[in-house]
UniProtKB/Swiss-Prot annotation:
Pathway: One-carbon metabolism; methanogenesis from CO(2); methyl-coenzyme M from 5,10-methylene-5,6,7,8-tetrahydromethanopterin: step 2/2. This is Tetrahydromethanopterin S-methyltransferase subunit E. The chain crosses the membrane at residues 4-24, 62-82, 84-104, 132-152, 164-184, 229-249. The lineage of its organism: Archaea, Methanobacteriati, Methanobacteriota, Methanomada group, Methanobacteria. It is found in: Cell membrane. Part of a complex that catalyzes the formation of methyl-coenzyme M and tetrahydromethanopterin from coenzyme M and methyl-tetrahydromethanopterin. This is an energy-conserving, sodium-ion translocating step. One of its GO terms (molecular function) is tetrahydromethanopterin S-methyltransferase activity. It is a multi-pass membrane protein.
């Protein structure tokens, strides 16, 4: 195959994986309230507003995804040494990392929410069981895509062959998607999804802090409703932002024309 064609193909696949991974990352962190607006979720019980949100924000998005994308990359490299196909190795790395992510999410939710017991905030076990599945599914896609991007960047093809190992590249991109998720997607989540009962465009005055939207279409609002809200606009825009960054960096650094 012509090296130029191979480089363009890898560039397209890398960009597509970046867009998908970042989009799903924003949805996952919105479902788990692991983002900047989680402070409003944490503050709500203190203001007398009990809720049914899943809150696992004991670590911000950048550091959490930096760590776990690095773990996924390390497991993938270890699996590649077994001479398994790259797709299988990526899937195994993402799957094992997702199991660790579930343990992290469970302990984070129980610890974070039980810390509000002083303000009579209960721990809803159904929120734990109902949301772990979507969190795991979204997290698997993120780890698979980000580790895939790191793997593609190390292929011995003209314009790529990055000198850094896969785990290090995964950590760099993990921190990047966490930062972009906080900077782009969280604006839509925190300023709109959590305050839909407030006047649109009016900002969030200090007096409204903690007064989050707790009622959904039917009964109490659930984390999945937040995910459904943000996936319509905020998450795709976040994915496009990261995809364009990866595309521009890859073309600029490796001179792919």
């Amino acid at each position: 195959m012509d090296p130029a064609v191979a480089s363009l193909g890898i560039l397209a696949l890398t960009t597509a994986s970046a867009i998908i991974g970042q989009t799903i990352e924003d949805v996952e962190t919105n479902i788990g309230s692991q983002s900047n607006p989680n402070s409003q979720v944490q503050l709500a019980p203190q203001m007398g507003n009990l809720h049914r949100f899943f809150n696992k924000a004991i670590a911000g998005e950048p550091f959490a995804y930096c760590t776990f994308c690095g773990v996924s990359g390390a497991i993938t490299v270890a699996t590649l040494y077994l001479h398994l196909p790259a797709v299988i190795a990526l899937a195994i790395g993402a799957a094992i990392t997702t199991l660790i992510w579930l343990a992290y999410s469970t302990t984070a939710y129980l610890g974070r929410v039980s810390g509000s017991a002083t303000f009579n905030q209960p721990v809803f076990l159904d929120m734990l069981t109902e949301n772990l599945g979507p969190i795991a599914g979204h997290a698997f896609i993120v780890f698979f895509c980000m580790t895939g991007v790191a793997y593609l960047m190390t292929l011995p093809v003209k314009g790529f062959a990055h000198p850094f190992p896969i785990p290090v590249i995964g950590m760099i991109w993990g921190m990047t998607i966490g930062a972009i998720g906080s900077a782009v997607g969280d604006v839509y989540y925190g300023a709109e999804a959590e305050f839909v009962h407030k006047k649109f465009g009016g900002g969030i005055p200090v007096a409204s802090h903690g007064d989050i939207t707790r009622k959904g279409v039917l009964g109490a609002r659930s984390p999945m409703e937040v995910g459904n809200f943000t996936v319509k606009y905020g998450s795709p825009i976040t994915g496009m932002a990261f995809g364009l960054i990866v595309l521009s960096i890859t073309r600029g650094v490796y001179n792919i024309e």
